[in-house]
Amino acid sequence: MVEENETGTPGTSRTVTFHDGRKLTDAEHFVFFKVKEVIADKVAEAEILESIRKRSECKPTDEQFISDIINELFYSGEPPKGRKSERFIGPLFDPEKASTASGPMDCTDVVSYDSTHPNISEISKKEEVEMQSAIQQSLASSASQNISRPTMLMSNLEDMVRNPNFSTGLYNSGNTCWLNCLSQVLYSIPKFRSILYHCAPLSWHEQPITNVKIENQQHAELLMLFRGLFAELQFSEMKYIEVGPLINMVDKLSKSSKGPSTIGTQQDATEMLTLIFDWLQRAFDAALHAQLNPEFSNVSDEENLVISDSTTTAPNSDIIGAPPGYNAANLSLPSSSHVDPKSTLNPMYVNEKEPSSTPTSLFGTRSKTIEVNESMDTEAATSSNLPGNSVENHPNPAAPEVDDNKKAFCDKLKESFNNIFSSVCYTESVAEDGTVSVKSNVRNCPQFFQLQVTYGNLHDALEAATFDHGLGNTASHVRNLYDPLPAVIFFGLSRFSFNSNIESKLHDKFTFPKIIFMDRYLKCNKEQLVQLRSHRELCRDSLSEVRAKLSGLRRYPQGNGEVRLEDSFQTVWQAVSNFREFVTFYLKVSQKTFFSREDAHENTAFVGPLTPSTYQSSSDNCSSKFVKDGGKLFPTFTEGFFPGKAAFIETLQNMLEALKTEERDCLAEEARLQEVIDQTYEVPELQQHKYELHAIIVHSGEANRGHYWTYKLKKSIDGLEEWEKLNDQNADRVDWPKVESDSFGTGSRDAPSAYMLMYVRSDAEWLVSADKLTALEAFETIPPDLQEKVLQKRDEFKEKLQRFRENKEFNYQQFSVDSPTVQSTEETPSSFSWYRDELEDIDIGDENANPTKNDYLLNARLDSYSVPIAPDVETSEMKRMVSQMWNQITKIAPRKYTDSQDLLDSNLRSVMEGESGGINFINSRLGYDIHELRSDADNDVEGVYNAFINEYLGLVKDLHELQNSKFVVFVGFQLQRIHVPVLRYLLVRAMAVSELGIISQRANNELSGMSSNSHDKGTAMLQIALLLSHFFELGVMSAWGCRSSLENIHVILNDFKKKNSRGSEQIEVTYCAMIGARNARICNGLLREMAYFLESYSIFFVSQKHIEACTVFSTITMIKLIMQHMASKTLQLIDMEFHLSKNERRVRFEDIIREVVSSVCIIHHWSKSYSKEFQNEINLKELMGLLHLKVEFMVSLTSFEVADPKYECLQAFKAMVVNTVMDLERASNELDYDVLDGAVELRELKKYFKELQLTDVKVNNIITSYDPIIESLVKI
């Protein structure tokens, strides 16, 4: 027996011990009661604990661990007295089935206590409740110690708050865009989600689900997951949610049907829709069965413990009775019925009995054709036909009485389901003599039409799918008619083809209207349709003849080519009538160019037309440059040469007019016939069943890769049409032209195109009435379990958001500026932080990227939505930092940029320049120079514009040097927390500021549109771009300063040793090395001060050790040069002054001393927090100790006259040793800002650093060289 000891301390959990005094750990608590919950008192508690503890090397909360314990307790040795030996197999304990029943076990999920459970005795109920409470408290207290798992939440939770005017998005966890789209499309059918909400019985709310057949258990779990997902989509306050459990269940179902894994792989959306719908339909049947048969259970043991896997006789069936079979007449919702295998129409409706090797998927074939026929689809279905039930060979006892209201409720659900999706297709064969024979009747659920995009438009493709003009060599044809059609119709657009067994995607343009009438496909209109279709076929035959005539007139054979017959007659008429000769003479007269032609031309024999080679051959000769170009001399036909010329010309004119008239008549007849064909069904009688386009799934990519997103119709309260783009996490408002351009396709491989369409019957108000409820009214209509789940999720998010806001407010108070922020009285628009989630790794080349990746780059134009503004505190902080950095940049390079925006645009132009720049990328994509791109070449303009935004970064991401030379590349890969919309802004602005003709114009239009749509006219985005460009410029400047310093140190340590140089040259080079080091220190220090704002420390081009090295070596070298001048009897300190050769500024001795003092203070400051981590680093503490010792010795033993400038230098050195207070350093413009490309700067810096090997040894050598100089000073 278990004892409980309360500590008595408020808020602490109880400890649970056995009589032997051994306390149970939290994990042991959890496992103990998991096991005890199942086996109750059939095994002694001590035996349970012993079995748990002897497996302590295993993970104690793993499901396999618990399963092993239970199996061991029931299989090891003889069972205890009074306990039967039983085998436990079920979803909870069978490893193969455990994962299908629930997700991975979580220590925080304790199974709730059920007081009605038959295994809980009345004596132990109170104790059990208290024990469960103790476990829950213990686990809750230890939950905080669990390792946190990655989350889909953004680092800035403000970005997760959903705008109530937009739909909830779905998180893309990796190639799940297809499931996101299907979920959004199914969710957009209000009545369907209502059916899912209410069809599930209460018994399904607990795991594992037992009130269902074993073979349908996973289907039931799928339905429950869709219920939860739809409820979250409808009521969540988060911008997007995840579908993790749902994709796992779909994967299990796919693999159980011998299909491929769906996790992490792209799937064919249309194929997966049919499969998911089949699974949901099975679950719906099972749900209604459970509603009407609440006693049904797949558990066959008398104590509800043992789940039998027998396929013969169920144990104890005489006690609990065999579960009743499904009532096929009342509950079946068939997905398909038998179809004559000879029919070639509508392969989607044919249930092939044998696996087919023909691929049916855009993304590949499944290993086996999945049967969708159910044995309960017909009245003849009996329980003996249903596999997996161990008791179906026994007569079914009478089912318990069910309330009439429950029966009516289930009937209503079934009726609504059928009205939404179910239809019956009647396939008829019409012989040549008009005899009609019915081939088959097929029930389709859902009604899914597979259309070939090669027909170009929806109605032609639909007619081809439903009407066949002949089978084999017979003259009969087959037609499909429907009665009825459901409220929702799906169209799949077949966009795959095979060429040499290689699957490829068809990018053909395919148009479809927003409204269609389906009356022409209904069985009730059969008689009228037969007449209209017959008339239409006659018109089509006539149209075929007319087009054949037009083809003969316009494509008349000539040699190896074709010519227009009218043009040929026109040419002959002009030649015979000397038309060209007259034109030539007229032009010469009109230009006052008179010359006489020889009469011989009139008698020139006509020997045939002059071919191009005849008169071009001489011009091709090398001497043609000396021969004047005489133009063309056309042959002349005279009456003498051509008797009857006048009559022939008249005949030609008549024939030419006849040809023109015939062509005009053919064109008019073609237009008339086409209009008749198009208007055949446009009669009021065939416009009763109106369907409206409701959703589109669009695909971009190729057959084996790409990305899906959804367009969904939303109607405002006043009935206005609005379209919403649901691209994984993102929901944006778009207009119909945008939907049309993305859906119809253009034939280009780069253009997206529609892949699936969903139409909804316009008069089906009952279908969408749920969307007309207020949020509160809708919430009250969903079942209590979903209400609880929604409220729980909402409370969790609100709590996280509140904590985030409190932390964020605290952080802003720490870094807020002193100047007050003016608060606007207007409504504050939505704001955003431009930081991206740290857990999101940007992968520009991925085509299944999150909206923060390339998908957002390609599709979310900045002018397509209102870009939120940055919070006032962020904007003020950014402006302050930009101003501070701009001041430092202008001190170093005062004339390089006119203002901050010029700095930004200059960096953006550099992105487009160079061998690996954007201009070369665009030229390579176009195949010709960008400046030759015409403004009317819409496809090229659109393609290359999007390609640059989408692919350029992915192309150069592996060129690591470019990450520090191209500004936008640096932002994209070094500052990985920057949101992708900022990257798009930078790429678009880069095209705008470059001279790229129509491309620049297009980029400027997008930026202008963004400014118009933004509440702050794009100020926030510009401010972010300015800040990033200044960060980049400071990074390049720090690399430049460090490189120039090391370059001068290289000259000091190497070149000056090889040649006799003047002292002034050494001083100038050393001074320049010090200035370079100072600028590097200032730029790098300023970046470090501001790194907190980016929450990133990847913005530095150079490391601290590089800056320390160039500062130390330049400083100690300059000290040595000063000492040499002080110890010299001939040299004076004024001799150290020099003119900077680059800017002709004279550097005075005082400037040099001041620079040395400042650098020594910096080194002293570094040495205070110095800890040597690498062997080759300079030991700053030892350096400062040696330097102070040398200088103090020199100062103490040396004296000069007060009037001597060397005395002032000595006092400066003395002050440097005594006073180590670091003064504020200022950047210097004494050096020419001859900055190289960022990558080149770093390459040169690393080269010099490696060559110089600036280590303690070289430092000691320079410091040791002070000794003879100090001895000379002492002697003086």
From Swiss-Prot:
Top class in the EC scheme: hydrolase
Record's catalysed reaction(s): Thiol-dependent hydrolysis of ester, thioester, amide, peptide and isopeptide bonds formed by the C-terminal Gly of ubiquitin (a 76-residue protein attached to proteins as an intracellular targeting signal)
GO biological process entries: protein deubiquitination; proteolysis; regulation of protein stability
InterPro entries for this protein: Papain-like_cys_pep_sf (IPR038765), Peptidase_C19 (IPR050164), Peptidase_C19_UCH (IPR001394), USP_CS (IPR018200), USP_dom (IPR028889)
Biased composition (Polar residues): 380-393
CDD domains in the record: Peptidase_C19I (cd02665)
Pfam families: UCH (PF00443)
EC number(s) reported in the record: 3.4.19.12
Region of interest (Disordered), ranges: 375-402
One GO cellular component, as annotated: cytosol
GO molecular function, one term: cysteine-type deubiquitinase activity
Domain USP: start-end pairs: 168-762
Active-site residues from the entry: 177 (nucleophile), 707 (proton acceptor)
Keywords linked to the UniProt accession: Hydrolase, Protease, Thiol protease, Ubl conjugation pathway
Family: Belongs to the peptidase C19 family.
Protein name: Probable ubiquitin carboxyl-terminal hydrolase K02C4.3
